[in-house]
Amino acid sequence: MALLQIAEPGQSPQPHQRRLAVGIDLGTTNSLVAALRSGRSEPLPDAQGNVILPSAVRYLANGVEVGLGAREAAPSDPLNSILSVKRLMGRGLADVKQLGEQLPYRFVGGESHMPFIDTVQGPKSPVEVSADILKVLRQRAEDTLGGELVGAVITVPAYFDDAQRQATKDAAKLAGLNVLRLLNEPTAAAVAYGLDQHAEGVVAIFDLGGGTFDISILRLTAGVFEVLATGGDTALGGDDFDHAIAGWIIEQAGLSADLDPATQRLLLQTACAAKEALTDSEAVSVQHGAWQGELTRGAFEAMIEPMIARSLKACRRAVRDSGIELEEVGAVVMVGGSTRVPRVREAVGSLFGRTPLTSIDPDQVVAIGAAIQADTLAGNRREGGELLLLDVIPLSLGLETMGGLMEKVIPRNTTIPVARAQEFTTYKDGQSAMMIHVLQGERELISDCRSLARFELRGIPAMVAGAAKIRVTFQVDADGLLSVAARELGSGVESSIQVKPSYGLTDGEIARMLKDSFEHAGADKHARQLREHQVDAERLLEAVQGALDADGERLLSDDEREAIAFQMQELRDLLTGTDGAAIEQQTKRLSQVTDAFAARRLDSTVKAALAGRNLNEIEE
């Protein structure tokens, strides 16, 4: 008789057999894959012992080269050697063109305005390029671990929007990887340090990589990692340091700013080498072609000081959003290769009043944390129990209401996964459909927010305005992807959409949106109040006009009609202005002057309904 095999839900039925899962840091400059081995999370090396894989892909006529060889070939073959592709993930062709000379590629348009890079193998999308990097990491992991992977946790910047996250998942799928979860990079770093040092309290994760900057404020308590607030800049990183040095070389050497792609690549490689050398040296000799000069650490720090200031400003904002004081931050974790720059560490330490933590390699810490989470999600139970991660959404999500107003359904910094619902109603009598316009942002008017998607709810039963009840539910999953559903409660008609925008935010747009929301808070509040008063007034004017057309001649005297018409015109005149208080007062006056008319209409309706019926019929 066979025994029934029993296992904990989500756990392996054979505890001694580990399910192979990895953490992947898909970075702008470099990528890594890590896994738990002998109880310790560590990056996995390639056959030559290198753990870091340059995020570079070169397309050849008869093959694909990924990693160091592709990066080294970039100066001689810039059009087919794709670097920093992470900056293109989830972006539109128009967004990519704004990056200009920073991207020496030939771009062609594709479906849904997605940018394709023209290579010797034909057009390649950023998703395909990223997939080629992930394929190498997957193969490395399976070769090292000796088996097939059940899945991977892939890290993304906390500020990646829906389009960028979806593009990352699409790349993983194309690479043959099962995505267990997308994990914010700062949260992954917290996982690594929290387990290694059993830290509790408030921690700041300062993540300055090759192409993006993220700051996260987390509270660590008894194995729970809660992200209190996030901030950052999608267009700030070590690449920008390189471009600053490259600009200095162009100026010092008297070069033309209009360089061919090969020269651009060579110049950026020279700049990157100088930046890395200045980590340990006070000065470095720089040579480009026939020109040679000396770059001091002080001069380099002066170049990047505005960029560092931008990062510190984002840190202060994140601390404010988290509702704590700078002094409450008990530890600062440095993540990303660009945090090796001495001036960066010095500035961050000065801001938070403590020496930043760098005991885990800043290039490896994200992958190490992702591997720990992957091992848990794969069903391998670890000592110390489960780990709970509470990420947050970076920008508020909501929908458009009458008057072009943004109604926030899920506020920014809400812990995910999350589901929130609100009820709305119809604006006009007999309205049978409703357009649901999903938005992202912090401002009060939809013109100042980002449109994510639109869909229609049809089949709403004919009712008077305000009678229908439409419940709109927003749901954000653990990967930060949004789905929206609308349901009319009386009839049960329903419509939904999964938000997968065809392109992401432009460089710095998220940071700009947050900045604008703070700077324009007062004006936005006034604008919202004005639009609300205007909508109320327009609704009343429409209702009164409809009543006059139907029953005005029958139920009102000439003087009464004139009085109502006068108040209506007064209100229409005010609607062309910006005095919200005056509009509100005139709306009240029009409502008061039509009260008697409304009562007569009600009486008339009741009499008509009762005409020809006796008491017994009514009681029945």
UniProtKB/Swiss-Prot annotation:
An example Gene Ontology molecular-function term: ATP binding
GO biological process, any: iron-sulfur cluster assembly
Keyword Chaperone annotated: yes
InterPro entries registered for this protein in UniProt: ATPase_NBD, Heat_shock_70_CS, HscA_NBD, HSP70_C_sf, HSP70_peptide-bd_sf, Hsp_70_fam, ISC_FeS_clus_asmbl_HscA
Matches recorded under Pfam families: HSP70
Highest taxon in the source lineage: Bacteria
Keyword ATP-binding: yes
Keyword annotations: ATP-binding, Chaperone, Nucleotide-binding, Stress response
Similarity comment text for this entry: Belongs to the heat shock protein 70 family.
Its biological purpose: Chaperone involved in the maturation of iron-sulfur cluster-containing proteins. Has a low intrinsic ATPase activity which is markedly stimulated by HscB.
Full protein name: Chaperone protein HscA homolog
Taxonomic source organism: Pseudomonas entomophila (strain L48)
